[in-house]
Curated annotation (Swiss-Prot):
A single MF term (Gene Ontology): magnesium ion binding
Organism of provenance: Salmonella agona (strain SL483)
Protein family membership: Belongs to the cation transport ATPase (P-type) (TC 3.A.3) family. Type IA subfamily.
Protein name per UniProt: Potassium-transporting ATPase ATP-binding subunit
Active site: 307 (4-aspartylphosphate intermediate)
Gene name as annotated: kdpB
Length: 682
């Protein structure tokens, strides 16, 4: 991935964030965050009190009240700034995507073939179902499916990858994205969306936050923060008559300062920024999430369904051996295997053709000149082959070929069964070749498990995440590779229906399931999974069914997606712990300052030895505002992530952010008190 990463504090972003922070001071904007709305209301009230004191309408220290009011406004501004900075980083990422959208004309065909008559129309007028012709050098005008042709496509504007990709009709690489450019040849594309609904439009809307809604965990935490705010508001409201009855009424300014310091303003001010930054970090990994809910769900996932090919193994299986059945010549097996693979464009199919050529000098033959019919592989049949000169040759998985043989009145030989087991026990994939009802033998396909993947699965296991390998291989091959890779479980001979059933089974047990997919046959399982990462190179159906799209089309990215989701949840939890813990230190600063005149015994709580009641209150309010600024980098970058169990993670958080939340305010408030005293403001 070559997408440029934004620095944490770009000067342009800082200026824009400051401007947006001021704009967010409106009551309508503040009302969306109840905790900060209370601070905003306190700021307005103390500002009015300051003006009244300056004009002599009421008695009191205008300087003290004015400084309190100023720092309350700073508290609101700093919270606005954190949110605006997070949104600004996302908008900057979106601007690079907007540059991809260009006003252009499209060749809309009157019939679904490349030589049909075409009309030049603005790309914005294209509708779902329209057929367009795109030639070399053109920008693809809409999202769609290739129905004819094949071409090299530059998708760097979206994926950040400079290497072109092949898009062609009739397979899992038929999906194209509007805004990408054709480098060679031509494509006939059926538009799959209306204007404003394209993948680019959805990416931009998501990244800019236009479709951002609070996630369930955010809503639950917001309710908790509101409840705490109401409790502290009621408690503070009772303190005025309580102190007045004692003969020394506490001023409204002090009560407002006390309330603001007691309510959880730190997490209240950073909560929105954490959510926006989480989605931004996901985009930084070249993954587009359709909502914050998807990112959050990634953090709660406890079952990963991982395709074997390309995720656990390198995915470049190569034919390495022909093992004929008893009574069959190896050359005969190789010839049949090559014929069955002539029109198979997969790496495995091409390797079979090449191996037959190397072993027995069997030359490739043109399928069309042979007047043969190629039978393509499907997820349901799990075999492919060729019909030629009254010969019906098939190659495929053991079970598929066994059913084929038995349905044609044949018998599956015991020696071939043994050869299949021997190949599978070595971790290779056996393909069986059959002509009619006669089994000819086995092709050995070798694949290599990715380096370091076993250690990554061990880390996931520490975190309580179960890994399940999904493969179309037979159980013996699957078991051998699963043991080598270190996964917890596997699903062998997988079909789309089996994947869907497995996901539902785990969900019925109360688990959250994540998976990847790229084909139309993956769409039902992607739609069912809690976190569904569709490959950008996959079909439109897969991308619509998933709640994330990986622009790099790298199935291994699912593990990184889970890490980012967990980091976002950890960041939110850590800052919540810190916010609530640092309230304790503020009690020791403000409570003695506010009520020591009425109850001298409370001076015993002044463990920090603060200079005066006024300096104590000012120090607490100033610290309350500054801590938001100091925590913005942590909210945007996320806390440092380590794969730990839930209990170990809880202990780490309580130690770092619970104890830190207790200690840091004591130090910070004392330092501010000393500075205020030196400046003569206390």
């Amino acid at each position: 991935m070559s997408r440029k990463q934004l620095a944490l504090f770009e000067p342009v972003l800082l200026v824009q964030a400051l401007t947006d922070a001021v704009k967010k001071l409106s009551p309508r904007a503040q009302w969306r965050n109840p905790v900060m709305f209370v601070v905003w209301a306190g700021s307005v009230l103390t500002t009015l009190l300051t003006l009244a004191m300056v004009t002599g309408q009421i008695a009191g220290s205008a300087l003290f009240t004015g400084i309190i009011s100023l720092w309350l406004w700073f508290t609101v501004l700093f919270a606005n700034f954190a949110e605006a900075l997070a949104e600004g980083r996302s908008k900057a990422q979106a601007n690079s995507l907007k540059g991809v959208k260009k006003t252009a004309f499209a060749r809309r065909l009157r019939a679904p073939r490349h030589d049909a008559q075409a009309d030049n129309v603005p790309a914005a007028e294209l509708r779902k179902g329209d057929i367009v012709l795109v030639k070399a050098g053109d920008i693809i005008p809409c999202d769609g499916e290739v129905i004819e042709g094949g071409a090299s496509v530059d998708e760097s504007a979206i994926t950040g990858e400079s290497a072109p990709v092949i898009r062609e009709s009739g397979g899992d690489f038929a999906s194209v994205t509007g805004g990408t450019r054709i480098l060679s040849d031509w494509l006939v594309i059926a538009c799959s969306v209306n204007p404003g609904e394209t993948f680019l439009d959805r990416m931009i809307a998501m990244v800019e936050g236009a479709q951002r809604r609070k996630t369930p965990n955010e809503i639950a935490l917001t309710i908790l923060l509101i409840a705490l705010t109401i409790v502290f508001l009621l408690a503070t409201a009772t303190l005025w008559p309580f102190s007045a009855w004692g003969g020394n009424a506490v001023s409204v300014t002090v009560l407002v300062a006390l309330l603001v310091c007691l309510i959880p303003t730190t997490i209240g001010g950073l909560l929105s920024a954490i959510g926006v930054a989480g989605m931004s970090r996901m985009l930084g990994a070249n993954v587009i999430a359709t909502s914050g809910r998807a990112v959050e769900a990634a953090g709660d996932v406890d079952v990963l369904l991982l395709d074997k090919t390309g995720t656990i193994t390198l995915g470049n299986r190569q034919a390495s051996d022909f093992i004929p059945a008893r009574g069959v010549d190896e050359r005969t097996l190789a010839d049949a295997a090559q014929l069955a693979s002539l029109a198979d464009e997969t790496p495995e199919g091409r390797s079979i053709v090449i191996l037959a050529k190397q072993r027995f000098n069997l030359r490739e033959r043109d399928v069309q000149s042979l007047h043969a019919t190629f039978v393509p592989f499907t997820a349901q049949s799990r075999m492919s082959g060729i019909n030629i000169d009254n010969r019906m040759i098939r190659k495929g998985s053991v079970d598929a070929i066994r059913r084929h043989v038995e349905s044609n009145g044949g018998h599956f030989p015991a020696d071939v069964e043994q050869n299949v087991e021997n190949v599978a026990r070595l971790g290779a994939t056996p393909l069986v070749v059959v002509e009619g009802a006669r089994v000819l033998g086995v092709i050995t396909l070798k694949d290599i498990v990715k380096g370091g993947i076993k250690e990554r699965f061990a880390q996931l296991r520490k975190m309580g995440i179960k890994t399940v390998m999904i493969t179309g291989d037979n159980r013996l091959t699957a078991a051998a590779i699963a043991a080598e890779a270190g996964v917890d479980d596997f699903l062998a001979e997988a079909t789309p229906e089996a994947k869907l059933a497995l996901i539902r089974q785990y969900q019925a047990e109360g688990r959250l399931v994540a998976m990847t997919g790229d084909g139309t046959n993956d769409a039902p399982a992607l739609a069912q999974a809690d976190v569904a990462v569709a490959m950008n190179s996959g079909t439109q159906a897969a991308k619509e069914a998933g709640n994330m799209v990986d622009l790099d089309s790298n199935p291994t990215k699912l593990i990184e997606v889970v890490h980012i989701g967990k980091q976002m949840l950890m960041t939110r939890g850590s800052l919540t712990t810190f916010s609530i813990a640092n309230d304790v230190a503020k009690y020791f600063a403000i409570i003695p300052a506010a009520f020591a005149a009425t109850y001298p015994q409370l001076n015993a709580l002044n463990v920090m030895g603060l200079h005066s009641p006024n300096s104590a209150i000012l120090s607490a309010v100033i610290f309350n505002a500054l801590i938001i600024i100091f925590l913005i980098p942590l909210a945007l970058k996320g806390v440092s992530y380590k794969p730990l169990s839930a209990s170990a993670m809880l202990r780490r958080n309580l130690w770092n952010y619970g104890l830190g939340g207790l200690v840091v305010p004591f130090i910070g408030i004392k330092v501010i008190d000393v500075l205020l005293t030196l400046l003569g403001l206390a």
